[in-house]
Curated annotation (Swiss-Prot):
GO terms for biological process: rRNA processing. It comes from Treponema pallidum (strain Nichols). SUPFAM superfamilies: Metalloproteases ('zincins'), catalytic domain. Its cofactor is Zn(2+). It comes from the Bacteria. This is Endoribonuclease YbeY. Single strand-specific metallo-endoribonuclease involved in late-stage 70S ribosome quality control and in maturation of the 3' terminus of the 16S rRNA. Belongs to the endoribonuclease YbeY family. The gene is ybeY. InterPro entries: MetalPrtase_cat_dom_sf_prd, YbeY, YbeY_CS. The keyword Cytoplasm applies. Its EC number is 3.1.-.-. Binds 1 zinc ion.
Length: 160
């Protein structure tokens, strides 16, 4: 049985694509597979311009990136008295995801899942020194991706 998690998904800079409804169930499946429960987090799909501004404001880097994670670390109880951890926000540039998918010769939906998982791992407290494949966090990211490779695999318009 699935643990309780709350995931909100929104778009900034464009209308929500038809597949956007698949994102929250995918995130919940990843959280469940990692025994993470009672998280409340948000996913924002955006443009390069939007994420570039955030990257500059919060990291001093004046260029777009594929994913940013912002921890919140708060807690609250819902009306039923269930305690939730405010994990934070995962911001994903769909333009950068598409560019990455072309550069690494993978499907766009695979790269989108990869950056979602990457953001979840950052919010769970993991980090990496660089992007070399030997990094513990990146090895775990790829194992989780392989475990969930069939989820969120259809209906994404930039799939080739």
């Amino acid at each position: 049985m699935s643990e309780v998690n709350k995931v909100s998904v929104s778009c900034e800079g464009f209308c929500p694509p038809p597949w956007i409804g698949q994102v929250a169930p995918f995130v919940c499946a990843v959280l469940d597979s990692q025994a993470i429960s009672h998280w409340d987090l948000s996913i924002v799909c955006c443009t390069d311009a939007f994420i570039r501004r955030l990257n500059y404001d919060y990291r001093g880097i004046d260029s777009p990136t594929d994913v940013l994670s912002f921890e919140n670390d708060g807690e609250y109880c819902d009306d039923a008295g269930t305690r939730f951890f405010l994990a934070g926000d995962i911001i994903i540039s769909l333009e950068s995801v598409r560019e990455n998918s072309e550069r690494f010769h993978v499907a766009a939906h695979e790269e989108f899942k990869r950056v979602l998982i990457h953001g979840i791992l950052h919010l769970s407290g993991m980090d990496h020194q660089d992007n070399s494949p030997g990094q513990e966090m990146l090895r775990l990211q790829e194992r989780i991706l392989a475990q969930h490779c069939r989820v969120l695999s259809s209906g994404i318009p930039w799939e080739s």
